[in-house]
């Protein structure tokens, strides 16, 4: 884990924006289960959870790719994607939970007088029901889904939209996510970004090379990067 730079507590951060899957919520168990149900429909054996977990932050594209070796544009991908999404929607929050200490982290962010919100590439049809089933997340000051703006991350539009909704200048927002596109979106939006190193990172990824200000190994470590109370 990278340590906060000297003077980090004096940074004029007024809002924290979070990715959802792999940052606030551990949704990989339900995403992997949905993918394996698609495989089961086709007479294929389930893939190990450890194989699928690193793909969970990449949505249907990543999971269907991992499960069937196809990509958007390939024959069969649209049907596999739609079947996967139907299975996922039918069992959206069976095993999904908040990561450890996320509820306490959000409460402390609020106690420090900071706004917070969620910016995810997950479509609203999945985002909104999931947040309702993970109550602390329903307090978010803004929720921007993958289809809220014309562009999804790594485009900066979703983050800029969230900043506008919170009434906070982009440079005074901090973005936290577990995928390279999250960090790219934050930088493009003019926001400092932090890697959620406890999320769904693949062993072949090199987050230390991403243009983030730091990496945290657990949610509570984010507090060291934020202004103190008062």
Can you annotate each of these PLM segments?
Residues 2-14, 50, 124, 128-230:
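Asp-based, Mg2+/Mn2+-dependent phosphohydrolase catalytic module
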Residues 45, 115, 192:
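Residue-level detector of anion-binding/catalytic polar loops
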């Amino acid at each position: 884990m990278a340590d906060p730079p000297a003077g980090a507590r004096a940074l004029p951060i007024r809002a924290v924006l979070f990715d959802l899957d792999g940052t606030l919520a551990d949704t990989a168990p339900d995403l992997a289960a949905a993918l394996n149900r698609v495989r089961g429909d086709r007479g294929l054996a389930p893939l190990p959870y450890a194989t699928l977990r690193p793909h969970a932050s990449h949505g249907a594209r990543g999971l269907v790719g991992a499960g069937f070796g196809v990509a958007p544009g390939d024959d069969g991908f649209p049907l596999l994607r739609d079947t996967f999404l139907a299975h996922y929607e039918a069992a959206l929050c069976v095993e999904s939970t908040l990561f450890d200490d996320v509820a306490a982290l959000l409460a402390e962010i609020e106690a420090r007088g900071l706004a917070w919100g969620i910016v995810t590439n997950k479509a609203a049809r999945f985002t909104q029901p999931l947040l309702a089933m993970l109550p602390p997340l329903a307090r978010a000051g803004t929720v921007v889904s993958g289809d809220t703006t014309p562009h999804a991350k790594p485009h900066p539009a979703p983050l800029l939209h969230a900043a506008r909704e919170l009434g906070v200048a982009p440079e005074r927002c901090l973005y936290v996510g577990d995928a390279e596109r999250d960090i790219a979106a934050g930088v493009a939006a003019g926001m400092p970004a932090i890697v959620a190193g406890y999320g769904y990172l693949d062993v072949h990824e090199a987050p230390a090379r991403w243009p983030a200000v730091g990496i945290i190994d657990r949610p509570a470590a984010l507090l060291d990067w934020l202004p103190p109370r008062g």
